[in-house]
């Protein structure tokens, strides 16, 4: 965001139940986050803008383009599941209440385990601390509901309705979301641009930062068109 902020006005939106956003809601489903983006733009008077989302954020961004096409000029998805079944098995299991409950009631052990596994997820040395910080700002309900909802998501039937420029950015070594989800995106949105990062996993913005920023900025700088 620092680099893009030199050329664009940028906003980082924390979904309900995550980061600095409110934690007192009855549901944290993908559809709730789609509505949140629409409401956020309405409140700030943003008529139309490019949306860039990582992981579930990209799934939400693409869903906004489908449900609120007047809001979106471009979409960039980064390591995002188009179909929820593409999530790694441990993540899908974490969407079940009893497993999520065990994890959150053994949070210290859970965080320790993730720290040990972090080199397998992302090579950037900053990643363990970033992950630990994010976990500390997440509730059991938001984690459980969002993962369970994402697991059931399937955008394939709606993809042909997307008429704005789309780019998918995927790491070939992703072990959180199946790295070939770019194929699903390309099949549903034939005009989508795809950029693959051979040496990156689920976090290409960290592992191949310079290339990531250059590719993203090049896409955003292109003239807006309706397809």
What do the PLM-derived regions correspond to, one by one?
Residues 15-19, 82, 201-204:
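Alpha/beta-hydrolase active-site loop signature
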Residues 62-67, 73-104:
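Flexible "cap/lid" loop of the alpha/beta hydrolase fold
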Residues 53, 57, 61:
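Gly/Ala-rich beta-loop-alpha elbow adjacent to hydrolase catalytic centers
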Residues 86-91, 105-161:
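Conserved alpha/beta-hydrolase catalytic His-Asp/Glu region
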Residues 5-52, 214:
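Active-site loop/oxyanion-hole signature of alpha/beta-hydrolase fold enzymes
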Residues 164, 178-187:
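Short alpha-helix in the alpha/beta-hydrolase fold that links the catalytic acid
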Residues 162, 168-170, 174:
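Short beta-strand/loop motif that positions the catalytic acidic residue
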Residues 192-227:
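Catalytic active-site module of serine/aspartate enzymes centered on a nucleophile-bearing elbow/loop
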């Amino acid at each position: 965001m620092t680099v893009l902020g030199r050329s664009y006005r940028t906003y980082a939106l924390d979904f309900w139940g995550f980061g600095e956003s409110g934690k007192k809601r009855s549901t944290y489903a993908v559809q709730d986050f789609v509505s949140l983006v629409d409401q956020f733009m309405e409140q700030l008077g943003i008529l139309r803008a490019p949306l860039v989302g990582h992981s579930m954020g990209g799934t939400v961004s693409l869903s906004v383009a489908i449900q609120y096409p007047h809001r979106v000029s471009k979409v960039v998805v980064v390591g995002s599941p188009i179909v929820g079944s593409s999530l790694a098995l441990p993540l899908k299991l974490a969407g079940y209440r009893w497993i999520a409950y065990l994890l959150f009631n053994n949070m210290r052990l859970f965080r320790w385990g993730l720290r040990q596994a972090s080199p397998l997820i992302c090579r950037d040395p900053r990643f363990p601390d970033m992950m630990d910080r994010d976990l500390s700002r997440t509730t059991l309900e938001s984690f459980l509901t969002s993962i369970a909802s994402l697991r059931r998501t399937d955008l394939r039937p709606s993809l042909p309705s997307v008429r704005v420029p789309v780019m998918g950015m995927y790491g070939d070594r992703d072990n959180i979301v199946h790295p070939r989800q770019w194929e699903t995106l390309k099949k549903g949105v034939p005009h989508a641009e795809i950029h693959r990062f051979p040496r990156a996993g689920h976090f290409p913005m960290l592992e191949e930062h310079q290339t990531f920023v250059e590719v993203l900025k090049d896409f955003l700088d292109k003239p807006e068109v309706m397809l």
